[in-house]
C-alpha cells in the first residue's frame, strides 16, 4: 500500500451552508493533485450528495446541529475522501435494494423521490464503501490517473 502524500481534515457543523466550502476545498485539493476537470466536477457532486445526506438524515431526531468530519488522503494515483457523522445510521445495502436500480424505460413523471444520492455517488466515484457504526462513514476513492480507472469492472494495471 502506498503511503499518503498529504492528509487534510475538516470538522464542520452539519449544516447545508457549509456544502459550498467543502466543494471549494475539494476543488483546491484535486487541482493540486493534478486531477482532471471532469474528475473534480464528478467528485464535487458525489461529496455534495454525501454531505447533504448527512445534513438531512444524520441528526434529524436531534435538535442540536451535529458535526461532519471530512478528510482527504492524497496518494500518487488516487484521492480518498472520507465523510463521517455521529448521527442516525442506516442500512446501506437494504436501502439500496429497497430503492432498486432505475431503469431507462421508467417514465420520468413517475420516478420515485429519494435514494438517487446513493446511486449517483457510486456512479461518479471509482470506489465507495459505507460503514455504519457510530453514525455513518462514507469512504470514496477517485483515481486521478486515467490508466488506473476501472475498465468493464476490472482495474487496469500499469506496468
From Swiss-Prot:
Statement: the UniProt record of this protein carries the keyword Nucleotide-binding: yes
Gene3D superfamilies: Histidine kinase-like ATPase, C-terminal domain
EC number(s) stated in the UniProt entry for this protein: 2.7.11.1
InterPro entries recorded: Anti-sigma-factor_SerPK, HATPase_C_sf, RsbW
Catalytic activity of the protein: L-seryl-[protein] + ATP = O-phospho-L-seryl-[protein] + ADP + H(+); L-threonyl-[protein] + ATP = O-phospho-L-threonyl-[protein] + ADP + H(+)
Keywords recorded for this protein, A-Z: ATP-binding, Kinase, Nucleotide-binding, Serine/threonine-protein kinase, Transferase
A GO molecular function held by the record: sigma factor antagonist activity
Enzyme type, top EC level: transferase
Pfam families, per database record: HATPase_c_2
Function: Negative regulator of sigma-B activity. Phosphorylates and inactivates its specific antagonist protein, RsbV. Upon phosphorylation of RsbV, RsbW is released and binds to sigma-B, thereby blocking its ability to form an RNA polymerase holoenzyme (E-sigma-B).
Family membership noted in the UniProt record: Belongs to the anti-sigma-factor family.
Name of the protein in its database record: Serine-protein kinase RsbW
